[in-house]
Amino acid sequence: MTTTPVIAASLTIPPLENGDKLTRWEFERRYQEMPHLKKAELIEGIVYMASPLRFESHAEPHANIIGWLALYKAATPGVRLGDNATVRLDIDNEPQPDALLRIDKGGQSTISQDDYVEGAPELIVEIAASSASYDVHQKLNVYRRNQVQEYLVWRFYEQEIDWFRLQAGEYIKLEPDSDGIMRSQIFPGLWLDKNALLMGDLGKVLVILQRGLETAEHRDFVNKLTANHS
């Protein structure tokens, strides 16, 4: 009597592993079969899977960034905020950035029928351990090439924040003014007190942001977005 081996359905699709070289379609197919997996990214055709997240070096800074961006979103109709949303950038790149801001109507990105971001959001934020992280190298090049207009990287262990603005195909660092305030050039009124954020003073971060939200530039931006929605 012969028997036919039965292969469990869960084993017919190989699991994702760090370093796998995959197409975006195969990456998505495997990722969807691993619902327990919270974060995996495809960068230049290579799979990167996140390690367990530490509190002080990632989870808390991440939450502070989301709080900062959430206040901006609340005051800016027509702007949408994503937290760890998968982004289909191109055939070799599907990152899952810590945070993103996108212009809903008339912006660079869209929401697909299956509810993914497609195209480059206007702003992406990543929390990185240090300058050795792939957030500062491979991802930076991918975001630049796909025309993410602004890219903010918080290098936690080096206590530094780099805010890049795309100009003529290259990323140029935005520098703080004499008061230590950094200002987005894509999202008027999105002001950041760099030192307050690095010190974990979310209250001061939000106070400075509120000042940006009270400017004429922000009011004009809101009027423009409102007109796009009408």
Where are these regions (language model features)?
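Gly/Pro/Ser/Thr-rich low-complexity, intrinsically disordered segments predominantly at protein N-termini
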Residues: 1-230
